[in-house]
Amino acid sequence: KKSLIMKEKMIINYSPNFDLKKRKRKQIKFLIFHYTGMRSEKDAIKRLTNMQSEVASHYLIKNNGEIIILVPELYTAWHAGVSKWQKKRQLNKSSIGIEISNPGHKNGYKNFSKKQIKTLIKLSRYLIKKYKIKKNFILGHSDIAPDRKLDPGEKFPWEFLYKNKIGIWHNLS
């Protein structure tokens, strides 16, 4: 179905992996980016919607730029795991998680597609505006769980996102 907020096709494929208690909009402070880290997109969708996996994000951006809605935004998706940013711990409760289809470091890590990044920018802008997310609270999974996670990885276009008014970028030169 077409979204009212974006031109990209959005597919609903709900995951059972979220807290049943609704949260308040004002609790949402972070935007967390992930890669799926699975051999195929089909495998990623299967894992993110399987009750036994106990993992899901709010959104998945497919290779072709389509968005799959996995968990409604006002519910806590299980995407961050053991996590910390500054003094805040367990970021699932205060974040929106976006998975981007990519095999990741263990399965042939590749560049993210232009369609994925275009969709990510639109979705991120929408979420940033809706929840008033601060630039320094737009993070990668590796930022909040550095001892156990690598995603979204070194091929993730942080500088390009920054140029599109998403997140921060430190130019060291």
Q: Model-predicted segments: where are they?
A:
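Short, Lys/Arg-enriched N-terminal segments with co-localized hydrophobic residues
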Residues: K1-I5
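Active-site-adjacent loop/helix surface patches within enzyme catalytic domains
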Residues: K7-K132, N136
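Alpha-helix boundary/interfacial micro-motifs
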Residues: S53, G81-V82, G153, W158-F160
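Acidic, His- and aromatic-enriched active-site or binding-groove loops in soluble protein domains
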Residues: L60, E154-S173
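A charge-rich, low-complexity, intrinsically flexible signal that marks solvent-exposed coils, linkers
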Residues: W85-K88, K149-K155
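Acidic/histidine-rich, metal-coordinating catalytic segments
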Residues: I133-R148
